Amino acid sequence: MLPRRQEYGMKRSGGARSGSVINFRSAMKLSSGRRSSAVLPSLLTFLVIVASGGLLLMIEKGMLNGMETPSPRSNGRRLDFHRGQAGGRSPDAADLESQILQEIRNRTIKTMCSHKNMPHSVWSLSLLQRKTLLQHVLVNDKHRFLYCYVPKVACSNWKRVLKVLSGALENVDVNIKMDHRSDLVFLSSLKPEEIRYRLKHYFKFMFVREPMERLLSAYRNKFGEIESYQKKYGVEIIKRYRKGRAKDAAITGDDVTFAEFVRYLLDEDVERMNEHWMPIYNLCQPCAVSYDFIGSYEHLESDAEFVLQHVGAPPHVHFPERQTWYKPVTTETIHYYLCSLPQKLLRELLPKYILDFSLFTYPLPNTTAAHCRH
């Protein structure tokens, strides 16, 4: 087990930090009215029982039978992560909240991935599953880490960091168009014995994001801004799902509605989806890979800094700041798009990403008719 980290806020030095701790950052937040209040120990017990027992019941009743791909697995470590007084909360309240959420996540992951139908190594995956995974894991031999990148979860910035660490870029702020293939080493390019060694001995991490927020980010970006996606996917979607347009040669694909996009997703096999909207568990297979750290998009800066500290990145290497043109997907935006969907589509969409919600402890969005009227 890695040593407990002290003084998280200290500046990085050239070598690996001796006072580090690995943890899974939970993205689920307690209600704002309780942020500064202590939580009774009995609540911890209750939530753990509900989370692990409820999901186990889902498995036993076959509610996840349609999800043939594996769900994430914890590496079994007891994990702590101290953020000091971030968000105005006292350290004690923040630590207790983190402890509760870590217990829920760890028990949930352990329960789901211990099921007999779940693979427990890269080599027990199907050929397609293993190909997808290995093509999404980036390797840095100098600092001995593996990073499973997830599109729409700051992966472009992480690729910049990897290029700086390898010497391909001078710094992360260089103003160039990101090439997502060059100067990067993918696990898929290595021999089986080289893959096994790195999976066993290297620090492994990934980052997650609220599933519907990630999906909306992909939809708005790819169909609103990227012409190649409009031509490749948009034209097909409109011809398939918009009445009277099946043979329309004038379709440009730049006006795909969210409902049309969702209909397309529901007809797609999750294992063959485009990586930008493929569920995270299909991309990174955390049941088959025991990740040492799972960071969250919601705490991107602090989680990224922790990773850089742990792998011993030089002090001048920092995680890039968000671009000035960045527009976050707000809670109101998610509410607007989801509530605009017919209830039938909504009921079918959420189960498509149910493992991303449950394993990474993201609460399902409230899409009841009463809530959507507000």
Question: What do these predicted regions represent?
Answer:
Residues 2-374:
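Membrane-interface amphipathic segments in extracytoplasmic regions
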